[in-house]
């Protein structure tokens, strides 16, 4: 008899295969072992560190090849942990001073670090604890000579089942064999969910008990649209879901027919669908999915995975490649957004209690022109190879925009004096991520050429709710009327001055949000490339005038639930 488990739908698709249960390895050891050769234990620890570096570098490179540099960046953080003398030295000292074995020294010191970070009322520090936990587990396995689960060894059709999938696990998934996965924990914005959408495999997360219900090799169905997981399905269920799977793939083929189509509503209003990218490697997905431009090029990934700042020439070549490939379509490049959750090993950033509200993005760039100016020069030089727009992230005041623009104009003059060509048709804009910026949108609109609303941060700053914290996740509300009112305010301010507004957060490609954003007058929707064709089909079936009426009603609602009900009534 089959069993139905409910979870959170994380990635579209239907997977039907045998369960591959990720079993946690036995990493137990004897902490009371008498150690006679202390230096051999230190050497064992050092060897385990080096072996872990080699392993993680391979995993990182595999992740970059399959998923792009932005998804591989998590492993740069893990490699930083393995190179951190503030962690490595205390472990070596522990082994020598307390005369304990390598496993004990590692475990006791990392446990202390993890405990300290987790006790901080700061989600960024808690994420560092997760990095240390993941890395220390790998090092401990090497010390003990134990193999960690390796999904890359799967050589037949399978559905991965586990408590959660670590970044290392997801980076090793082979799309040829892995049809989908199911986890006990996680939500739609968890790392494993985001990775599953990049891999385009079915996923259900947050089932709470899947590992207790499934045995190795059980036949399992994963419905990534509904969040249903069926263990040991009946013959009728297998047939029904095989049909649903076929329909899903047929639908994907149908969507491909829209690749070169216009995005235009039934009443003749055009919308622009653009893609978010992290590196030039992402361009093939942009082209394959019919993007009409790039609405967000995250340049920070040029700076990651290396031990020194990229040169002006390296940056120029990357920007040039993107602009040339897009062949005259608009490319919106975000200047360096480092700090917060993104660190660089060669940049000594101050440790802050809340780095998301601290020294990051445009604040850092204006304070360190030796970092900012080479990027501006590279962008200006590349501008003659396509349609370049530049936007500054995390702008809170009009002075920050003016200072950044002034620096850019200075570098333009310098380049012209040096004999370089620079386009005269570059638009300058800002990310709207801070409520203060949205509140002063009418002031900014007089000076910027465009706005791009970064909803991921705007939502958490407006509702004072960390989107990575499970305890307050109920407050992370994209459809809260307060968010919709801010979005409306920004769009109206830009249109009043003859400017345009885009959106590059997760919300831009959300099927519930699209009708509302269309109704509010959003000009550009920038999203993951894999979401573009679905959004095009949705918009092409909507009336702009009707969506404007819907949006006007939505901003008068009191709660997110009321807004969602309004949109759901539209679908009926």
Swiss-Prot record:
The reaction takes place in three steps, mediated by a phosphocarrier histidine residue located on the surface of the central domain. The two first partial reactions are catalyzed at an active site located on the N-terminal domain, and the third partial reaction is catalyzed at an active site located on the C-terminal domain. For catalytic turnover, the central domain swivels from the concave surface of the N-terminal domain to that of the C-terminal domain. Its EC number is 2.7.3.9. One of its GO terms (biological process) is phosphoenolpyruvate-dependent sugar phosphotransferase system. GO terms for cellular component: cytoplasm. SUPFAM superfamilies: Enzyme I of the PEP:sugar phosphotransferase system HPr-binding (sub)domain (SSF47831), Phosphoenolpyruvate/pyruvate domain (SSF51621), Phosphohistidine domain (SSF52009). Homodimer. Mg(2+) binds at residues 433, 457. InterPro entries: PEP-util_enz_mobile_dom (IPR008279), PEP-utilizing_PTS_enzyme (IPR050499), PEP_util_AS (IPR018274), PEP_util_C (IPR000121), PEP_util_CS (IPR023151), Phosphohistidine_dom_sf (IPR036637), PTS_EI (IPR024692), PTS_EI-like (IPR006318). Its main location: cytoplasm. Belongs to the PEP-utilizing enzyme family. The N-terminal domain contains the HPr binding site, the central domain the pyrophosphate/phosphate carrier histidine, and the C-terminal domain the pyruvate binding site. The lineage of its organism: Bacteria, Bacillati, Bacillota, Bacilli, Bacillales. General (non sugar-specific) component of the phosphoenolpyruvate-dependent sugar phosphotransferase system (sugar PTS). This major carbohydrate active-transport system catalyzes the phosphorylation of incoming sugar substrates concomitantly with their translocation across the cell membrane. Enzyme I transfers the phosphoryl group from phosphoenolpyruvate (PEP) to the phosphoryl carrier protein (HPr). This is Phosphoenolpyruvate-protein phosphotransferase. It catalyses: L-histidyl-[protein] + phosphoenolpyruvate = N(pros)-phospho-L-histidyl-[protein] + pyruvate. It is an enzyme of class 2 (transferase).
């Amino acid at each position: 008899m089959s069993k139905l488990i409910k979870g959170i739908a994380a990635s579209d698709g239907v997977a039907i295969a045998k369960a591959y249960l990720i079993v946690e390895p036995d990493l137990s050891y004897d902490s009371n072992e008498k150690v006679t050769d202390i230096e051999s234990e230190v050497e064992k620890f050092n060897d385990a560190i080096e072996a872990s570096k080699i392993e993680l570098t391979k995993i990182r490179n595999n992740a970059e090849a399959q998923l792009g540099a932005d998804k591989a960046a998590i492993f740069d953080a893990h490699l930083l942990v393995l190179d951190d003398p503030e962690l490595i030295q205390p472990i070596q000292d522990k082994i020598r001073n307390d005369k304990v074995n390598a496993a004990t020294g590692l475990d006791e010191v990392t446990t202390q670090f993890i405990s300290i970070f987790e006790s901080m009322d700061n989600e960024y520090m808690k994420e560092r604890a997760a990095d240390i936990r993941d890395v220390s587990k790998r090092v401990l396995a090497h010390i003990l000579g134990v193999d960690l689960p390796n999904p890359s060894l799967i050589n037949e059709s399978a559905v991965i089942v586990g408590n959660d999938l670590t970044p290392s696990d997801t980076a090793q998934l082979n799309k040829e064999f892995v049809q989908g996965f199911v986890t006990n924990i996680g939500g739609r914005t968890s790392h494993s969910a985001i990775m599953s959408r990049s891999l385009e495999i079915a996923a259900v997360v947050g089932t709470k008990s899947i590992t207790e219900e499934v045995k190795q090799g059980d036949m399992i169905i994963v419905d990534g649209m509904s969040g249903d997981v069926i263990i040991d399905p009946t013959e009728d269920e297998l047939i029904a879901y095989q049909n649903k799977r076929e329909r899903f793939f047929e639908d994907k083929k149908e969507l491909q027919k829209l690749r070169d189509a216009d995005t235009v509503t039934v009443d003749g209003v055009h919308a622009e669908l653009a893609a978010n990218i992290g590196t030039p490697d992402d361009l093939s997905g942009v082209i394959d999915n019919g993007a009409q431009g790039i609405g967000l090029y995250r340049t920070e990934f040029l700076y990651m995975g290396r031990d020194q700042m990229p040169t002006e020439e390296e940056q120029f070549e990357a920007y040039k490649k993107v602009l040339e490939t897009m062949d005259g379509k608009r490319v919106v490049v975000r200047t360096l957004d480092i700090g917060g959750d993104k660190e660089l090993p060669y940049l000594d950033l101050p440790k802050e209690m809340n780095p998301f509200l601290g020294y990051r993005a445009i604040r850092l760039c204006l304070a360190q022109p030796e970092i900012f100016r080479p990027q501006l020069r590279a962008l200006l030089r590349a501008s003659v190879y396509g349609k370049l727009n530049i936007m500054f992230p995390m702008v809170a005041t009009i002075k920050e925009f003016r200072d950044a623009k002034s620096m850019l104009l200075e570098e333009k003059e310098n380049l012209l004096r040096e004999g370089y060509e620079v386009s005269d048709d570059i638009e300058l804009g800002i990310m709207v991520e801070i409520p203060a910026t949205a509140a002063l949108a009418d002031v900014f609109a007089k000076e910027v050429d465009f706005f791009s609303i970064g909803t991921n941060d705007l939502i958490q700053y407006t509702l004072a709710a960390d989107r990575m914290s499970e305890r307050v996740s109920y407050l992370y509300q994209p459809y809260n009327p307060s968010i919709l009112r801010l979005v409306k305010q920004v769009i109206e301010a830009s249109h009043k001055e003859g400017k345009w507004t885009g959106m590059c957060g997760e919300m831009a490609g959300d099927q519930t949000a699209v009708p509302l954003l269309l109704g509010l007058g959003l000009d550009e929707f920038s999203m993951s490339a894999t979401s573009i064709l679905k959004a095009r089909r949705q918009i092409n079936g909507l009336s702009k005038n009707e969506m404007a009426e819907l949006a006007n009603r939505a901003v008068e609602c009191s709660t997110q639930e009321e807004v969602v009900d309004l949109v759901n009534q539209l679908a009926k």
